[in-house]
């Protein structure tokens, strides 16, 4: 685990974005941890979040031309990541996001920002069922662009309805790499360093045994 990943886990814990306990997910599964990126909800939170996304992007080595944030949660993420790439990595990248409802006046269309073209890096908070990615792919392909990769904050590394995860399905269906700031494996490595969190470690490991990929 790299320094920025450990710092991201501590940031998420401090903002209660990441919690340990017992939580019922939308899928009905009982999970020993919960991650709600919507609680990164202040200016300082967003500035820090962008830096972590930018670190993960640079670390990945994936080449791309433009950042795309799917509405709605991906919009502030794409924006803050673009700012962080410019301020901290001297990479001034175009960014773009979609509207859920197309405008019929003014600039019109369902896209805001730079022209959607070239190799696109899609940024979002998490991938649960992959629905937002599929909707975004239709927009990307309709504009003649290609998907270079997907960046999310957390990869839960757990099976969907079948034997593989929603992330693995996206990688298979769109022949792209999905990267994340942290994974379930990183969370476990972090918990292993914290004796006071031993009860949570046991629960997370048991969950991985049952649902992990």
UniProtKB/Swiss-Prot annotation:
Query: From the record, what ranges are coiled-coil?
Result: none
GO MF terms held by the record: magnesium ion binding; orotate phosphoribosyltransferase activity
Q: What is the main EC category here?
A: transferase
Cofactor list: Mg(2+)
Q: Which residues form the signal peptide?
A: none
Q: Name one Pfam family in it.
A: Pribosyltran
Identify the domain of life. Answer: Bacteria
Listed A to Z, the keywords are: Glycosyltransferase, Magnesium, Pyrimidine biosynthesis, Transferase
Quote the InterPro entries the UniProt record gives.
Answer: OPRT, Or_phspho_trans_dom, PRibTrfase_dom, PRTase-like
UniProt-annotated binding residues for 5-phospho-alpha-D-ribose 1-diphosphate: 26, 72-73, 99-100, 103, 105, 124-132
EC code(s) of this entry: 2.4.2.10
Q: Which Gene3D superfamilies match?
A: 3.40.50.2020
Reactions listed under catalytic activity: orotidine 5'-phosphate + diphosphate = orotate + 5-phospho-alpha-D-ribose 1-diphosphate
Q: Which SUPFAM superfamilies match?
A: PRTase-like
Q: In which pathway does it act?
A: Pyrimidine metabolism; UMP biosynthesis via de novo pathway; UMP from orotate: step 1/2
Q: Does the keyword Transferase apply?
A: yes
The UniProt record gives the binding positions of orotate as: 34-35, 128, 156
Tell me the NCBIfam families matching this sequence: pyrE
Kindly state the subunit structure of this protein: Homodimer.
The job of this chain, per UniProt, is described as: Catalyzes the transfer of a ribosyl phosphate group from 5-phosphoribose 1-diphosphate to orotate, leading to the formation of orotidine monophosphate (OMP).
Q: What name has this protein been given in UniProt?
A: Orotate phosphoribosyltransferase
Record organism: Escherichia coli (strain SMS-3-5 / SECEC)
Quote the gene name from the UniProt entry: pyrE
């Amino acid at each position: 685990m790299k320094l920025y990943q450990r710092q991201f886990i501590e940031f998420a814990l401090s903002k209660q974005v990441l919690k340990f306990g017992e939580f019922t997910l939308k899928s009905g599964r009982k999970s020993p941890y919960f991650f709600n990126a919507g609680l990164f909800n202040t200016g300082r939170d967003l500035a820090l979040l962008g830096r972590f996304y930018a670190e993960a992007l640079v670390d990945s080595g994936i080449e791309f031309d433009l950042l795309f944030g799917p509405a709605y949660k991906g919009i502030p993420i794409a924006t803050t990541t673009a700012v962080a790439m410019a301020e901290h990595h001297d990479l001034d990248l175009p960014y773009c996001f979609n509207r859920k409802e197309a405008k019929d006046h003014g600039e019109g269309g369902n896209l805001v920002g730079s022209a959607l073209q070239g190799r696109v890096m899609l940024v979002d908070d998490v991938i649960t069922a992959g629905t937002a990615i599929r909707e975004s792919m239709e927009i990307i392909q309709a504009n003649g662009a290609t998907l270079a990769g997907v960046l999310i904050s957390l990869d839960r590394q757990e099976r969907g309805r079948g034997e593989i995860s929603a992330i693995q399905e996206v990688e298979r269906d769109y022949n792209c790499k999905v990267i994340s700031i942290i994974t379930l494996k990183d969370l476990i490595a972090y918990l292993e360093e914290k004796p006071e969190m031993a009860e949570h470690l046991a629960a997370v490991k048991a969950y991985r045994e049952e649902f992990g990929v």
